[in-house]
Regions:
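Conserved N-terminal glycine/acidic-rich loop preference
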Residues: 2-32, 49-69
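Short, intrinsically disordered, mixed-charge
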Residues: 33-41, 68, 72
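Helix-rich interaction surfaces within compact, conserved domain-sized segments
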Residues: 47-50, 55-105
């Protein structure tokens, strides 16, 4: 009897919406500016003490962009300090934090 190996299901990017919800404070305003500059397809909603960023398909937070807006070095892990909630699958490196849903084809 021979067993055939099956390849894992291919993953494709989804167009389902993702979001980030961050505390509204002086530091996150610069982070939000960087996010909206890098994600022109995103929409921003301001609430008391919170800012929610929605985007169809994906949302990316780039370290270099945030550093430019903050005017200092910034570690992607610092995003978690002000993170309230999110939706989507997370891909995180030293250079970016990416949200997107992955559907199996």
């Amino acid at each position: 009897m021979t067993l055939a190996a099956t390849a894992p299901a291919a993953r494709t990017a989804s167009t389902r919406p993702v979001f980030l919800a961050l505390q509204a404070n002086d530091e996150t305003l610069s982070i939000i500016s960087a996010i909206t500059a890098d994600n022109p397809h995103a929409s921003v909603a301001h609430f008391p003490a919170m800012v929610k960023i929605d985007a169809p398909g994906h949302l990316v937070v780039r370290r270099a962009s945030v550093e430019d807006h903050l005017g200092r070095d910034w570690d992607v892990q610092e995003l978690h300090v002000n993170l309230i909630s999110l939706s989507g699958n997370i891909d995180e490196t030293d250079d970016e934090f990416r949200l997107q849903w992955r559907d199996h084809a």
